C-alpha cells in the first residue's frame, strides 16, 4: 500500500539543504525537469544572497501551511470535500505559478480569476492513494462534481473550474478564502 504525504508541483523544492538523507522517498508521477544543487555551493549561495535565503524560508513556511491544510483535509472532510479540496489546491498552485511567469507545457489556462482550467498531475489511482480513498470513491466523487456543474472534464485529466468560489464552497473552506489570499501575494 502506498501512502503519499505530499505533492510537489513546478517550482517546488525537494529535500532540505544540509541533510545527507531525506526521511522519505520522492517519486515522479509525471515527467519532470529537475535542477540539482551540490550542498556546499548551495549553502554558500544562500549565505551570499539573502533574498534567496528569504525565499527558501518562505517556501518552507508554505510547505508547513500545506501540511496543516493536508491534516485538516484528511481528518475532517467528507470524500466529496476531499476531492474538491484537492482540485482547489491544484488550481491555487497553478494559478499562483501562472501569475508569476508564463507556464509552458503545463496545460494551465486562466481566462478570469473565477474561471480556470488545468491538467491534473495525478491519475485516479494516485489520487486515491493521496487522499486515502478508494479509486471507486474518487471516480464517483469526480463524476458527481462534474454532474453538479462544479467542474467540467476533457478526457481523464483536463479539469475546468467555471466558478472557483463554488469549488471552494464544495471543499468546505468557509473559514477563509485561501485561494484569493494565496494568489494575491
Question: Where are the regions that the model predicts?
Answer:
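Amphipathic, well-packed alpha-helical segments that form the structural scaffold of globular domains
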Residues: 61, 65, 84-92
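Phosphate-/nucleic-acid-contacting segments
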Residues: 92-185
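A short glycine-/small-residue-rich loop at the edge of a beta-strand within enzyme catalytic domains
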Residues: 47, 51, 70-74, 78, ...
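Short, polar/charged, Gly/Pro-enriched helix-capping and turn/loop motifs at alpha-helix termini
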Residues: 52, 67-70, 74, 97, ...
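N-terminal positioning helix adjacent to the helix-turn-helix/winged-helix DNA-binding module
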Residues: 75, 79-82, 86, 123
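Cyclic-nucleotide recognition modules
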Residues: 4-69
Amino acid at each position: 500500500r502506498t501512502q503519499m504525504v505530499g505533492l510537489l508541483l513546478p517550482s517546488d523544492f525537494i529535500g532540505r539543504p544540509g541533510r545527507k538523507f531525506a526521511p522519505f522517498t520522492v517519486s515522479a508521477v509525471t515527467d519532470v525537469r529537475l535542477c540539482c544543487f551540490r550542498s556546499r555551493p548551495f549553502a554558500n549561495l544562500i549565505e551570499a544572497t539573502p533574498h534567496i535565503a528569504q525565499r527558501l524560508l518562505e517556501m518552507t513556511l508554505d510547505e508547513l501551511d500545506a501540511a496543516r491544510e493536508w491534516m485538516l483535509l484528511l481528518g475532517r472532510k467528507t470524500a466529496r470535500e476531499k476531492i474538491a479540496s484537492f482540485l482547489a489546491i491544484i488550481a491555487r498552485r497553478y494559478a499562483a505559478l501562472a501569475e508569476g511567469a508564463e507556464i509552458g507545457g503545463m496545460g494551465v489556462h486562466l481566462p478570469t480569476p473565477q474561471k480556470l482550467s488545468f491538467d491534473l498531475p495525478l491519475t485516479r489511482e494516485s489520487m486515491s492513494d493521496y487522499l486515502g480513498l478508494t479509486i471507486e470513491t474518487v471516480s464517483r466523487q469526480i463524476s458527481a462534481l462534474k454532474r453538479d456543474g462544479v467542474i467540467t472534464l476533457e478526457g481523464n485529466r483536463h479539469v475546468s473550474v467555471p466558478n472557483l468560489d463554488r469549488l471552494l464552497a464544495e471543499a468546505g473552506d468557509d473559514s477563509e478564502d485561501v485561494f484569493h489570499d494565496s494568489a494575491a501575494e
